[in-house]
Amino acid sequence: KDYDNSDKNFPVIYMHDAQNLFDKKTSFAGEWEVDETLNKMNAQLIIIGIEHGNDKRIDELTPFTNEKYGGGNGENYVRFIIKTLKPKVDSLYRTKSNAKNTAIFGSSLGGLISFYAVIKHPNVFGKAGVFSPSFWFSDEVYSLMEKSETSKAKIFFLCGDKENETMVSDLKKMQTLLDRNRCYCLKL
């Protein structure tokens, strides 16, 4: 909000599925109203919305493969954010570029890839918003967590009260692993 009227640097949140973030005309299942919400909160940060490749969404947002759905190119997508997009954003805008001030948010498959990114690359992403994550896509996500190094990343999990039982149990399972394996999570 105050970007044009100051010379301060701002934290950055990278959000997946940009088609759904700002405009109901471009959204698949309803606008998230990110801009309206941040204005109401008077939040001083930069949001970078990353559009998905439509029929490539499953490939882009899944770090593991699934026998039925395929996927598995998520690391390439995350690497694009780290090696190409983030450096460009940091060079064009006044950002606070350290991990503490860089977050990654998403829902469903976007939640899965956000979780993966913050666990695999905590030196880049210090925070993650993981909303209704598709942990069902592959059990490898649990192995990843168990094998990961100690992290000071902050992870915010969210799922709605109308989610199916699998979503809630998957989130609780992951929260237990995170609590046991050294991560700082805001509770469900």
Spell out what each predicted region is:
Residues 1-188:
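Non-catalytic cap/lid and distal C-terminal segments of serine-dependent acyl enzymes
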